[in-house]
Amino acid sequence: MTEVKSYKPGTFCWADLATPNPTAAKRFYSELFGWKTQDNPLPGGGAYTLARINGGDIAGLMGMTEKGIPSHWNSYVAVANVDEATKKATSLGGKVLAPPMDVMDLGRMAVIQDPAGAELSLWQGKKQIGAGRVGEHGALVWNELQTRNVDACGAFYTKLFGWKTEAQKGVFVETYTLFNDGAEPRAGMMPISKQTPANVPSHWTVYFAVNDCDAIAKKVASLGGKAVMPPTDIPDVGRFSMFFDPEGAFFAVLQPNQR
């Protein structure tokens, strides 16, 4: 269990869910992880929901009105200056999907797309640094890029965030790439399997920590979700599983090995 007061640039700091049915999403994730939720009205209408555990912000949920866009989890990386990071992303071959903008007095953000098409949000925190708790049951614990171009994305992210790469033996792929900042691991990367349908884009996956992966898998099914990967051991790491929630948003859970 970890309380967070600040984030170093280049660290994943937040995740939020965009869904056409926020009421159902709140019910699903609250029952699954034990989240408490609070709706915060937005200036243009609607609400942004904060999910909390033990008094700390964990993640966000928001309604989505655009047609044809499936429910999805967005990943956020902390940066010192959103405007500069966005310019750097474009110079490295990325695209800007949403230019830098202020989010009230909470912070400043932008949404970019890497050279292989995976979307990622950049966050310059002000009043809101990001998640207040990480690594405990129901909170963020890992982020993983599944991509169709490992080489291009490895070069892109190392130059954008100052990450380093470390090749490791994979469980389902020959090589799993670990991104780190020279001291701490920051994220993982693996190629999308050849069996994956061509219409599945490169994407960042959000992992939530859980105390019991198998129990969570059963609970997901009872709440209307669908397993994509059953509970599976990762040597020296823990036990994980992947799911679609009832609205079709993809996410994963990890039961870390006891240290």
Which ranges hold each PLM region?
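Core segments of cupin and vicinal oxygen chelate
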Residues: Y7-P9, C13-G56, S91, P99-V111, ...
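Vicinal oxygen chelate
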Residues: M1-K8, T11-P20, T49-R52, M64-K88, T90-V141, E166-E184, ...
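Short, low-complexity, polar/charged sequence segments that are solvent-exposed and flexible
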Residues: G34, G56, V79-A80, V96, ...
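Active-site-flanking structural segment that lines cofactor/substrate pockets
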Residues: D57-G63
